[in-house]
C-alpha cells in the first residue's frame, strides 16, 4: 500500500510587525510643543530641558524650539529642546 507518513509541524514561521521605534526629530530641527522626539523601549535616551517622558518612554517637546542631543555624563544620552 502506498501510504505517506504524516509530516511534522514546524514551530517556526512567525514574525511580528516592526514597532517604528527610533528618533523622530533630529538635532537642529525646529519643533512645536507636543512633538514626539524619540520612541523607545526603556530610557535609551533620557529627557533633558523642556522634554517630557511618556509612560511608554516616548520623549516629547514641552515647548516650541530647537532639538539638541547631548551627553549626560560619560555613557548616557539626553535630548533637550531650547526655545528660540
Curated annotation (Swiss-Prot):
<dbReference type="InterPro" id="IPR018261">
    <property type="entry name" value="Ribosomal_bL27_CS"/>
</dbReference>
<dbReference type="Pfam" id="PF01016">
    <property type="entry name" value="Ribosomal_L27"/>
</dbReference>
<dbReference type="InterPro" id="IPR001684">
    <property type="entry name" value="Ribosomal_bL27"/>
</dbReference>
<keyword id="KW-0687">Ribonucleoprotein</keyword>
<keyword id="KW-0689">Ribosomal protein</keyword>
<dbReference type="GO" id="GO:0006412">
    <property type="term" value="P:translation"/>
</dbReference>
<dbReference type="GO" id="GO:0022625">
    <property type="term" value="C:cytosolic large ribosomal subunit"/>
</dbReference>
<protein>
    <recommendedName>
        <fullName>Large ribosomal subunit protein bL27</fullName>
    </recommendedName>
</protein>
<comment type="similarity">
    <text>Belongs to the bacterial ribosomal protein bL27 family.</text>
</comment>
<dbReference type="GO" id="GO:0003735">
    <property type="term" value="F:structural constituent of ribosome"/>
</dbReference>
<feature type="region of interest" description="Disordered">
    <location>
        <begin position="1"/>
        <end position="25"/>
    </location>
</feature>
